[in-house]
A protein has these predicted regions:
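A short beta-strand signature
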Residues: 1-13
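A beta-strand/beta-hairpin structural motif
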Residues: 11-76, 83-85
């Protein structure tokens, strides 16, 4: 099942690493493909809900680092659930 969402992801420092609101194009996600903290947030949302969640590193990307997200990062997501297909 896909969830159609707008989301803005940032580090606790405020550095934005993803923003579908700004792009004007929502994204479709399979819940099982998402980090655990994002899954937990979506499971508590209804279509049309808009929320901001703070995800600790243990429920995010963990120890892994990449170019945009250092390991052990707390993540802040602004999420708007647009639909479920």
């Amino acid at each position: 099942m896909d969830n159609l969402c707008h989301c803005k992801g940032s580090l606790i420092s405020g550095k934005v690493f993803d923003n579908s609101f700004e792009r004007g194009c929502p994204e479709a996600f399979r819940v099982n493909d998402l980090i655990e903290g994002f899954q937990m947030a979506l499971c508590n949302m209804h279509i049309g809900d808009h929320c901001e969640v703070s995800i600790p590193w243990q429920k995010g990307y963990g120890k892994r680092s990449d170019a945009d997200i250092p390991g052990y990062s707390t993540l802040i997501f602004e999420i708007q659930l647009l639909g479920i297909a």
